[in-house]
């Protein structure tokens, strides 16, 4: 590490959100450009900075600051320079000259220890003197806090967050219970808090540590799709995390229950432990679904006649099950329509829409992702929105919503129980993708009396987020469900659809016969498989399906295998978008982002600003939010502004600071999970050995059904057979079914 010191000459750039600052310091006539997260430095201050010199592509040598210390001015010249800089509001150059002329080298001590004496100077009242003193105290408090936090290895950007949250309480919090940070500060997890606790000297069997570990494991479980964990599984994972053998878990669970952080329920003699937020979500969703489940009397002949009119006008013929779906949508406040590809879901939904249009009803259509909404729009001929957009997402939690803020929930929907959606009918497609959190937000915005129609394929993979909403609703048996199973004649001509249903039913799929849309390319070994995929994606498929290379998609079950996402993305990046002197790049860990790269947003960020632009680059629409699964292309990497601009498929431009690039990953290849709700002209699926838990029928079925015109399976036939025959799936712990049944049991008991 190297050190530099000097006066802060000027602030060139500062990002007010994350504190990233570019500034010059001067010492002995030498000027040095420094960069780093230094939210609280000001022009005129004298600092000593620790870090290293780095070479910038445009600005040559810069000093990258990792930590710094402020040195109080200790002579008249230094004080004059500091006060003249504008660091203290209310003091300009002339006033600074008067103050220094009066107090000389003793100026700074007097300002800190005897601020009332500043009132001796013409133009400074006693209230102004106290204001100057308070500003100095605030700055001193901030600097002291930064130094204190850095002693425990806390980086400056995180230190900024901590100080903004706690102020001068940080000393007691860090020394007594640093695990509070994991509860209160977005971006601080248990492991960070645990590292701080270790430095502070908190014992490994501390009550704070054990309770924080329990809560951390429960929250981590939600990232695996669970809304709760069985007691034994929770205990095992907490012991593995803490590296201790905790004896009396019941005591800590009782404490966390009393603190309203968790809920413990017994199901089939098994103790189930929930983070309270997710228990409440499932309970709320159950209650709101129950409220929407109302029945309406309507004459069957009237319904049949209206369906017949629609059939005649549209030139279609519905089968009995499709007609039943329309009738149930008419007679019920809530209905679920499920079925695989080619079973007539789109025709059924379009008929329902036409039926309600004849009633003069206001209809809203939505899907979980931009791609899914686009598919729904194209299929139905009516505009569909993402659920987030329909609910009018805002980039922050409402004032006073400390629970959401503490939980790290940075999204807020303008449409809710106080401002419901203005619609008579709401249709939501791709329901298998909807997690419990989004379902909770959606239902809050649906008024009793509004019809809700949920559409999806229950055999697809469940949502990436926690819960198993569609499956749980259907399995409860408490709401009207229509399952479409017949494959219609036009769909029956597609081997994609025929084979998808065969896979789902466990029937044999013939791979060695000629097919126009379901191809199997036999290759052995990962490298041979990848070489065949290269030929397909660049030379064969674009013309065959009439699509751009970037519109095709490689889908793979895993991230880490020889044909996993990470390896394939590196290989395909070099193949499809090789390095070039005119293309700017940015390295993030092991990944290089390059102008022209295909990328994907991998987490929901409700505060990212976006804009749409005219053909001349003029902004025409603005908003916030980029969502998990959004795909686009890197348009520009600016080393000057230190940001990356991505153009997403729906025309949104989003600019990411370099510090935000962990929200993106290359998307030449993506996991099957990430492809949910999307449809591509052609998909390429490697058939090579991978983790057994991912080599199953559910994954294969979902991957195959993502293709619109062509499926290309490349690899070993025995892997295909293994996946098609493996019906085991990762257990997902969810209990929406239980909450629904509890509501119904209470109602039945009341009657």
Positions of PLM-derived features:
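Structural detector for short beta-strands of small beta-barrel domains
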Residues: 1-15, 51, 631-635
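Short aromatic-glycine-enriched beta-strand elements
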Residues: 14-25, 640-645
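Accessory alpha-helical DNA-binding modules that contact the DNA backbone or grooves
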Residues: 20-28, 33-34, 42-52, 57-271, ...
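Loop/turn positions that initiate beta-strands
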Residues: 44-46, 596, 629
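Pre-P-loop entry segment of helicase/translocase ATPase cores
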Residues: 150, 219-220, 264-324, 396-397
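ASCE P-loop NTPase helicase motor core
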Residues: 323-326, 331-513
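Conserved helicase motor core of P-loop NTPases
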Residues: 458-624, 743
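C-terminal accessory regions
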Residues: 505, 621-623, 628-751
